[in-house]
Amino acid sequence: MKKQFNRMRQLANQTVGRAEKTEVLSEDLLQVEKRLELVKQVSHSTHKKLTACLQGQQGAEADKRSKKLPLTTLAQCLMEGSAILGDDTLLGKMLKLCGETEDKLAQELIHFELQVERDVIEPLFLLAEVEIPNIQKQRKHLAKLVLDMDSSRTRWQQTSKSSGLSSSLQPAGAKADALREEMEEAANRVEICRDQLSADMYSFVAKEIDYANYFQTLIEVQAEYHRKSLTLLQAVLPQIKAQQEAWVEKPSFGKPLEEHLTISGREIAFPIEACVTMLLECGMQEEGLFRVAPSASKLKKLKAALDCCVVDVQEYSADPHAIAGALKSYLRELPEPLMTFELYDEWIQASNVQEQDKKLQALWNACEKLPKANHNNIRYLIKFLSKLSEYQDVNKMTPSNMAIVLGPNLLWPQAEGNITEMMTTVSLQIVGIIEPIIQHADWFFPGEIEFNITGNYGSPVHVNHNANYSSMPSPDMDPADRRQPEQARRPLSVATDNMMLEFYKKDGLRKIQSMGVRVMDTNWVARRGSSAGRKVSCAPPSMQPPAPPAELAAPLPSPLPEQPLDSPAAPALSPSGLGLQPGPERTSTTKSKELSPGSAQKGSPGSSQGTACAGTQPGAQPGAQPGASPSPSQPPADQSPHTLRKVSKKLAPIPPKVPFGQPGAMADQSAGQPSPVSLSPTPPSTPSPYGLSYPQGYSLASGQLSPAAAPPLASPSVFTSTLSKSRPTPKPRQRPTLPPPQPPTVNLSASSPQSTEAPMLDGMSPGESMSTDLVHFDIPSIHIELGSTLRLSPLEHMRRHSVTDKRDSEEESESTAL
């Protein structure tokens, strides 16, 4: 206690008073002392952070560390996931490989942490918590010894001063000697402690390189750990890539064309082939294809399905615009356009050539420079667009329109420039490139092409979705077959469809049209489209325009073999009504069901007006060339143009009336007028079989059979012809077994008017005949086989009446159920 008191008093004197303070350390050792504290702080914080970096439990064994290591837990999870998904899936294989790799990495991590803990963390702990504190402890002990020495010196000095003034020298001298001995002993202890402290400090300074080696060891151990980990990863990466490359199902949108074709082993990109094949089945007659925007949700869904190589054809056959939008989106999302950046300048230069032949040659040269993959796909696409342009009368997509909407998706500049420039100049140039290629597709890419190369993407359902309603079912169809097209049509309003069916059967066409419902029926349009040909055929031979050479040389072939007719033109009825002129046996008009739509269209006009001229020319003979007209025999029902004009609905202004003896003038006036019906597409569904009965008061021209004189009709289904499902008009090609029709002659006795009509209608498509029609006869014709009617027994009449009544009741009950 006395020593402690002396130390405190000496410290107070040195701090407050002016007592002398002895400094036993040199300047260098004082600097080392300051550095000790800094090194201690750094070592302590580094040790703390390094310990936090350890993922395993510090100080535990390797097995215990492995169980609690996050990488080990991850590896176990991946292996369990692989077992759940199975090795037959790509994801299962990936999980298994990654799980094994993560387990190996976990083992390397454990080894790394053990080495870091042994070579870095523990030495830093000893430095910060043992070595430096020991030096600092000696420094504190030296400070105490110095205070003891200073206190002894101060007391000795005070004793010496007081002994000089005192009279009794002996007691004072003895006390001074004792204090001097104490002072010398304290000085010796200070000297020993100072030497030991100095040695430790100099040793610390000398060992600083060893302390630095701790951190070098840390980096080396980390490098070795990462090197081993990298070796493991590099060993497993080829296996993972091999598994992925072996897996064929990969996204195609936004991927390079070459990569997609190489992975899938295809020549035509899957989205292109799938979309084209589906459009060939359900979209060729869709108005505004590629121009009408599809539903965004359906487009997104279809793109995702195409990426997975899984397409629900039945679902998307109901929306051709979504299919066309997906095709445009795929072409636009290609990293490089289908016509390539490399040939962009050459395409643009070719489009700037003014002369048509040189322009086509320049485009052909650029097309031949395309890479093989791009050339195959552009050939496939252009062939499809060329085929689509064959239906331009219905779908309104001319080569120019297709070039406008598809051109920017086939070619665009590599450097995105001014948007205004791209929308004007560049867009027009690209249209000038694509349009002639579509127009001359067979010249650019000769030969036929098979669109459905790898699989059946097409839909068995043919639906035109621009029409609000499907056509009425045929009464000859089975009820089960009749429901199938009804289920596939657009579900607008069941009530409206039912009402339309009832009005159709009861009140006829005019009542339906008076309600504002647009009825799309290919049967009526076929008869309307043939009216122009009927008018021309009824005109005098001197007023008939010559047929085009191409149409005369190559009449349209029917898809089905034509049945030979005993007589191509039926003789006109005598004024007596039931008396028949002698001639070959007549053929039933019900055979028109078995003919193609083209032949049915050519055979039906005679029912309403085709024999009008025959009635005014009694000298006409039924003998004609068998190949001149593929249509069945004309029904013997002549009607006046004036009478038909009264009954039909006037969709356009009627031209000034001319005398009855000048039907050619009416044909000339109506030739330049477009038909309003041609503005709307013709649905490809089954035409309506229901015919409209003539009113009782229907007046006929003189010399013709009146309705009252005709025998009663047994059933509409017996005497009404039903057209088969309309098919696209095939390209004109020469028939090898049929000679070309002869041009009409002036001599009326040599051939009948029907023989003049046949070559005119053979080369005309329904769209061409419709475009020149002004007055439309909306009343369906009724073909009556008089010979077979007269031969019907009463039993057959009763049977047919019962069948008709049964079918009518089935249709009424079905419409009520709807």
Curated annotation (Swiss-Prot):
Tissue: Highly expressed in brain. Expressed at weak level in other tissues.
Protein's cellular compartments: Cell projection, Dendritic spine; Recycling endosome; Presynapse; Cell projection, Dendrite
Molecular function in Gene Ontology: GTPase activator activity; phospholipid binding; small GTPase binding
GO BP, one annotated term: modification of postsynaptic structure
Bias kind Polar residues: ranges: 598-611, 746-757
Keywords, sorted A to Z: Cell projection, Endosome, Exocytosis, GTPase activation, Phosphoprotein, Synapse
Site, Arginine finger: residue positions: R291
Residue ranges annotated for the Rho-GAP domain, each copy included: 255-445
Keyword check for Phosphoprotein: yes
Residues carrying Phosphoserine: S493, S809
Residue ranges annotated as motif PDZ-binding: 815-818
Phosphoprotein recorded as keyword: yes
Domain BAR, chain residue ranges per copy: 14-249
Biased composition (Low complexity): 563-579, 614-641, 688-708
Domain of life: Eukaryota
Subunit-level organization: Interacts with BST2 (via cytoplasmic domain). Interacts (probably via PDZ-binding motif) with SHANK3 (via PDZ domain); the interaction takes place in dendritic spines and promotes GRIA1 exocytosis.
Function: GTPase-activating protein (GAP) that stimulates the GTPase activity of Rho-type GTPases. Thereby, controls Rho-type GTPases cycling between their active GTP-bound and inactive GDP-bound states. Acts as a GAP at least for CDC42 and RAC1. In neurons, is involved in dendritic spine formation and synaptic plasticity in a specific RAC1-GAP activity. Limits the initiation of exploratory dendritic filopodia. Recruited to actin-patches that seed filopodia, binds specifically to plasma membrane sections that are deformed inward by acto-myosin mediated contractile forces.
Protein name: Rho GTPase-activating protein 44
Organism: Homo sapiens
Lineage start: Eukaryota, Metazoa, Chordata, Craniata, Vertebrata
Encoding gene per record: ARHGAP44
